[in-house]
Amino acid sequence: MARTAEEWRQRPNLDSNLIVDPRIYTDPEIFREEQERIFDKSWLVACHESEMPEPYDFRTYQHPGGHNIILVRDEDNTINAMLNICPHRGNLLIYEPSGSIKGASPSGGPKRITCLFHAWAFDAKGDCVDIPRCAEGYQERVKKGDYGLRGVKVEVGYGGFVWVNMDENAPSLKEWLGGSLEAIGDTLTEPLEVFHYHRAVIDGNFKMWHDTNSEFYHDYMHYHNRITGMMHPGYWDREYRTFEGGHAQVTDMQLKYESFKGHEKRELGWPGLAPGRWALVDLFPGITFNIRAPSMRLDTAIPLGHNKVLVEFRGLGLKSDTPEERAIRIRDHNSIWGPFGRNLPEDLLGTYGQGLALSDRTDAPYILQARLEGNKIHDEVGMRHFLERWQELVGRDPSDPYHNQPRAAE
């Protein structure tokens, strides 16, 4: 029979690392700490180099720490990153999500980022190149050489993705990754190209979304995954491998697409993966490299608050694809991972359902991440490993974030 209110609130007699206080998903103050201590210190994927292929192409990026960033390719073909804010009066410089500054804009001349407010202008490297009537108004007190944009640390790598880090003292991208992408290094050796982009806004915490990529116990929710994976040899042998920094890899397997009605047998592979093989790496705090030959998907989670997350989905193929190969990759990607695909909507629904149910902590005094299966595919070690790193950075115990719960007996 159903439990009483007192029984419902009773804390399970489990080790503390197997229990999570749901308030870490719902507390606005904890989210502000995450912005400062996690997102402002992490390397994050802002876009892919193929999304800004020509000199003077730009993209803007909504950084999870609350910053707006401009990414622009300069005349030397180098991608630069700067805060999207004018040093004069703090106005937003670029409003469009993407485009080019090669031609003139309503605010100013070509090859310039020009503020529409007072026409201060900057080049693609972030240097201030013009202040209208500077001498008349500022005399010698203000000089354009002192008023460049605020640069943001940026690296391009690991498949041509553009990574940014707000921390000027951050370790290199390679150090920060801690070897986590080396396991799929062979899949990132050839130039890639984005052929698909869509986004979803979910009423839930960003960690809820990352949880869906950090455990596969929820494969029961996916008809597609049950048919092509769970019912075949090799599925239960997959393992989680953890890396320093909160990152994790799921070992690859051969998917049986021929078991799914309407799906022809895969004949097109991916560098480092035979047709139909699947590899996945989760990066802390919200990036997932997900490759099911013949296509690749990259997820990036951008929290919009403690209870809302924007997830970007990119589908990628090889830059060297023939038109026929690209068509195969697009069809495969969109039929599985597109907005109406056979795999993705269930994950969105899972996160949305958690966001609804956990909005009132009295309705869920705790949640479990207690599956221990020797790091095999249904072990929840990926979630626990994520929160171990989370605890190191935020300084709160996920099972007792306010230090007011007695610990379970060891």
Task: Label each region the model flagged.
Residues 1-2, 25-28, 34, 116-122, ...:
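Short low-complexity stretches enriched in small and charged residues
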Residues 41-46, 51-54, 133-138, 279-285:
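Short Pro/Gly-enriched beta-strand edge/turn motifs at strand-loop
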Residues 78, 84, 153-410:
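C-terminal catalytic domain of Rieske-type non-heme iron oxygenases
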